[in-house]
């Protein structure tokens, strides 16, 4: 599903970021967002 990142999350490289939920490594209670357009643009956001 889609997700939008913001500056509050750890590992923010590009924010705000619109992309998809990636089952990557984020802290418990967070989910990873990955950009549709850039493989290096990702961040974690609170669930």
UniProtKB/Swiss-Prot annotation:
It is found in: Secreted; Nematocyst. This is Delta-stichotoxin-Hcr1d. Keywords: Disulfide bond, Ion channel impairing toxin, Nematocyst, Neurotoxin, Secreted, Toxin, Voltage-gated sodium channel impairing toxin. Coiled coil: none annotated. One of its GO terms (cellular component) is extracellular region. Disulfide bonds join 3-43, 5-33, 26-44. One of its GO terms (biological process) is regulation of signal transduction. GO terms for molecular function: sodium channel regulator activity; toxin activity. A synonymy between H.magnifica and R.crispa is controversial. Binds to site 3 of voltage-gated sodium channels and inhibits the inactivation process. It comes from Radianthus crispa (Leathery sea anemone). It comes from the Eukaryota. Belongs to the sea anemone sodium channel inhibitory toxin family. Type II subfamily.
């Amino acid at each position: 599903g889609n997700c939008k990142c913001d500056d509050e999350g750890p590992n923010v490289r590009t924010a705000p970021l619109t992309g998809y939920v990636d089952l990557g490594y984020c802290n418990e209670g967070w989910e990873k967002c990955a950009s549709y357009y850039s493989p290096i643009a990702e961040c974690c956001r609170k669930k």
